[in-house]
Structure formats: structure tokens, C-alpha cells
């Protein structure tokens, strides 16, 4: 081996190895102190790019989870206020039922209406004052709200909350038709809200005990529809007609015969003095339990009403009596022929009627109106009955909104669970790329420390070797 002093190759080799072991120690210490395998792009350029993309997703999902939790809070706020709305509507329904009872007089119903009015105002106050982060959520303005529930663009849940203002809930489909036809109602179908049609049995199967309640009457047709038991649908029937009364009697020898629905009201009654409208009314009402017909006076007019929708048939004759001029059955009057009743049909959803609709005097399609529970008036029995249907419609609307809020909360819960699962798996994947392996790095640190100590000792030995050349000079 050549002995030289200008170039100490062994020293250079020892220095290089010492630098390498020092770099190993620095890398190990950096990774152990930071916990990361990748501390800069030079550690793993591709790995850094992948891990940073994963970090963006993970942080995005963290925020998405917070957004979804905010959505749950909002829907809970809305649903809680709707519960109070439901309570108010239930109280209004109780009051309407109370007012519908005939034991109440007009003063009682006025008092009930006063409470109804206060409850209507409370419905609106509740809807207007329910807010989340300054936004009203129940007055109909919270529409197409978008919740960002993903780490990327357009990963959203969009929903709207319908208004529960008193003017916006309680719409019903209702119609009072023209007089029913003189044919039985057959092959009728009815559907509500676009649902499946329900067949209605022929009115021939719902005749009443009186001949005036035959299959052609509004009475039988209403009974047939109500007999189908369609939830949320009600049908009532009333027969009524008003006629200006022609003169009856007033001359010696005049007699008068009046029959209503086959029941004799006057039979060969001598009327040398003209029969007054009051006497006519009282005579008709004296047999109302048999005819089902009540008479009321309005000036010179008389109104006959059958509250159950039975037909009203009037027959008159007598001495000194001129048909078509005298009495009730004057030409073109309602009682010149059999008077048939009208049906009033109401439902909480739109109504579609198929089959022989003309026999009912109703339209084939009846849409919901735009009135709400703010329009109800229970100061009459009829108003109280109508109020019940509107309140039921309002309850259906509110309960539908509440169900939507419950479904939304469940959806947010599932979204959060999915985000947490994806975030967990993505974090594990990022960890495998980015995080330091402490076992390996501790081993590398120990190895570097040993090599550092050995390298330092060997460098000292290598640096002392050129001195052996001095022995040759001695």
C-alpha cells in the first residue's frame, strides 16, 4: 500500500459515513418529534400530494358533520314549534265540537268564538316568531334551503318547510251542488287527493223508511256516499224551496186540500175566510214529524225545508182553488213538481268523482280552496261542523310537516354516521402514508447513534494514520 500524506482516503471515507449516519439521526429525530413520516415534499413528493388531498377531504367532512348537526338543530326547532301548533289546533277542535252541540245558545257560541279568535292569533304568532339563527322557519319563507353535508361541491341536502300560518293551513275541497237528478246514483267512484278511486254502492241500497227518501233523493245519495266510509270525506243533504204563496180561500164555500209527502195537512177544510200564511205554516209544521218537512215564513214567502235531503212533494186542490195560481204550487214555483235536494260534499283533499256524476248534481273535479283556519266561525252549528273539517285538514298539514322534519332528522343522522365512517377510513389511509412508524424510526435512531459513535472513533483513527509516515523520516 502506498504511503501518502496529501490525501487521506480513509479519513474521507469515515467523514462520508459519519455524515450519512448524522443525516439518518436527523431524519429519525425529526420524524419521532413530529410523528410524521412526511415532513416536507422531499421526504415523499407523491405521498405528500396524496396525503394533502386526503387532509382536504377529512377537514371537509369534519365541517360537513357540523353542518348536518346544525340541520338537526334547525329541524328540531321547527318540529318543536309544530308540536305547539298541534296543541293549539287540538284545542280549537275541542271548541268546535263544543259549539256544534245544540245545548249551547248564541251567547255561549260567541264566547267560544272569542277563544277561537285568540287561538288563531296564537297560531300566527307561533309561526312568525319561530326562528333559527335569525331566520323564520314556519311562515313559509324557508324554501329550498341547502345544507352542505359533503366534502365536495354540490353534496347537499335541500328541503323546504311549509307555512303553518292560520291562513295557509285548513284548506278543504267543498261544493254544494245543484239539485240531484230523478235517477238513482249508480257506478259512482270517488277518490281524494289523487288516490285510488273507491266504488260507491248504488243509492238504491240506502233508501229511507219514507217514500220521499227513495233512491232518487238526495237523502239516499248522501247515505250511499257516507256509507263507503271514506276517511276525511263528508256529505250532507238538504232539500229546500221558497215560494210566494198565492191566495187560498176567502169565499163562502171554498175548501182546501194540501198533502205533503203523502201526508194530509188540510182535508176539505172550509175557508170562507182566506187562509193566512201563518196558518199555512202552522198546519204544515203540525205534521212535520210525519212529512220530514218544516215551513218558515219570510214576508209573503214560505220556505219548505227537509233537513235530511228527502224529496218534497206538494199536492193541492179544492173548491174555489185554481191550480197554478193559488196556494203553493203556482206555475214555475219550486213545488209545482217534486222538489229534490242538494248535496254538499267536503273533504280535506281534492275530490274526483267518476261515473254517473250528473245524478248527484256535483262537479267531477273539486279542488281545495285557499281558505285556512283563520276563516272558521263557530257561532252557528253549521259553522262549527264546517270548522271541524278545516281543523282536521290543518292537523293533517301540520302532521305532514312534522313527519317531514322527523324524516329529515333521521336523514341527517344517517349522513353523519356515513361521514364519520368515511372519515375514519380515510384517516387510516392517510396515516399509512403520512405518519411515522415509531418502531422503525426508533431503530433508525439507535442505528444512527451507534454509527455516529463508531464513525467518530474511526475518523480519529484515520486522521492519525499519516503520522506513521514520520517514522520513515526518522
UniProtKB/Swiss-Prot annotation:
NCBIfam families, A to Z = PRK12806.1
This protein's species is Legionella micdadei (Tatlockia micdadei)
PANTHER family according to UniProt = FLAGELLIN
User: Can the keyword Repeat be found in this entry's annotation?
Assistant: no
Gene Ontology cellular-component annotations: bacterial-type flagellum; extracellular region
Superkingdom as given in the UniProt entry: Bacteria
Q: What is this protein called?
A: Flagellin
* UniProt-listed Pfam families: Flagellin_C, Flagellin_N
Q: Which family does it belong to?
A: Belongs to the bacterial flagellin family.
Amino acid at each position: 500500500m502506498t504511503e501518502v500524506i496529501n490525501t487521506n482516503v480513509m479519513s474521507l471515507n469515515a467523514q462520508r459515513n459519519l455524515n450519512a449516519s448524522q443525516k439518518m439521526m436527523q431524519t429519525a429525530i425529526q420524524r419521532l418529534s413530529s410523528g410524521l413520516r412526511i415532513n416536507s415534499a422531499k421526504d415523499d413528493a407523491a405521498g405528500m400530494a396524496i396525503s394533502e388531498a386526503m387532509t382536504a377531504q377529512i377537514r371537509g367532512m369534519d365541517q360537513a358533520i357540523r353542518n348536518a348537526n346544525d340541520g338537526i338543530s334547525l329541524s328540531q326547532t321547527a318540529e318543536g314549534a309544530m308540536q305547539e301548533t298541534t296543541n293549539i289546533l287540538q284545542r280549537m277542535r275541542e271548541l268546535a265540537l263544543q259549539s256544534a252541540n245544540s245545548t249551547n245558545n248564541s251567547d255561549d257560541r260567541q264566547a267560544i268564538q272569542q277563544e277561537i279568535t285568540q287561538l288563531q292569533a296564537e297560531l300566527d304568532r307561533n309561526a312568525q316568531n319561530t326562528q333559527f339563527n335569525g331566520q323564520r322557519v314556519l311562515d313559509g319563507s324557508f324554501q329550498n334551503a341547502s345544507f352542505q353535508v359533503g366534502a365536495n361541491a354540490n353534496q347537499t341536502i335541500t328541503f323546504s318547510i311549509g307555512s303553518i300560518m292560520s291562513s295557509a293551513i285548513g284548506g278543504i275541497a267543498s261544493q254544494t251542488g245543484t239539485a240531484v237528478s230523478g235517477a238513482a246514483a249508480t257506478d259512482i267512484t270517488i277518490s281524494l287527493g289523487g288516490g285510488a278511486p273507491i266504488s260507491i254502492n248504488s243509492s238504491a241500497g240506502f233508501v229511507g223508511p219514507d217514500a220521499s227518501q227513495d233512491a232518487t233523493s238526495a237523502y239516499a245519495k248522501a247515505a250511499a256516499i257516507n256509507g263507503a266510509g271514506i276517511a276525511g270525506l263528508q256529505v250532507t243533504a238538504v232539500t229546500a224551496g221558497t215560494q210566494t204563496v198565492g191566495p187560498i180561500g176567502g169565499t163562502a164555500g171554498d175548501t182546501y186540500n194540501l198533502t205533503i209527502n203523502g201526508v194530509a195537512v188540510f182535508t176539505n177544510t172550509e175557508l170562507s175566510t182566506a187562509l193566512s200564511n201563518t196558518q199555512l205554516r202552522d198546519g204544515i209544521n203540525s205534521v212535520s214529524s210525519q212529512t220530514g218537512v218544516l215551513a218558515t215564513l219570510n214576508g209573503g214567502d214560505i220556505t219548505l225545508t227537509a233537513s235530511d235531503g228527502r224529496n218534497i212533494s206538494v199536492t193541492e186542490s179544492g173548491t174555489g182553488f185554481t191550480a197554478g195560481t193559488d196556494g203553493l204550487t203556482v206555475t214555475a214555483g219550486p213545488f209545482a213538481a217534486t222538489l229534490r235536494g242538494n248535496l254538499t260534499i267536503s273533504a280535506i283533499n281534492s275530490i274526483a268523482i267518476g261515473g254517473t256524476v250528473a245524478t248527484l248534481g256535483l262537479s267531477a273535479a273539486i279542488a281545495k280552496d285557499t281558505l285556512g283556519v283563520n276563516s272558521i266561525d263557530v257561532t252557528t252549528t253549521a259553522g262549527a261542523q264546517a270548522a271541524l273539517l278545516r281543523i282536521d285538514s290543518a292537523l293533517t298539514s301540520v302532521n305532514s310537516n312534522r313527519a317531514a322534519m322527523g324524516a329529515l332528522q333521521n336523514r341527517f343522522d344517517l349522513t353523519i354516521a356515513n361521514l364519520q365512517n368515511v372519515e375514519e377510513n380515510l384517516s387510516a389511509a392517510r396515516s399509512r402514508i403520512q405518519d411515522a412508524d415509531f418502531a422503525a424510526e426508533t431503530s433508525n435512531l439507535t442505528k444512527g447513534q451507534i454509527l455516529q459513535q463508531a464513525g467518530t472513533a474511526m475518523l480519529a483513527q484515520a486522521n492519525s494514520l499519516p503520522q506513521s509516515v514520520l517514522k520513515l523520516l526518522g
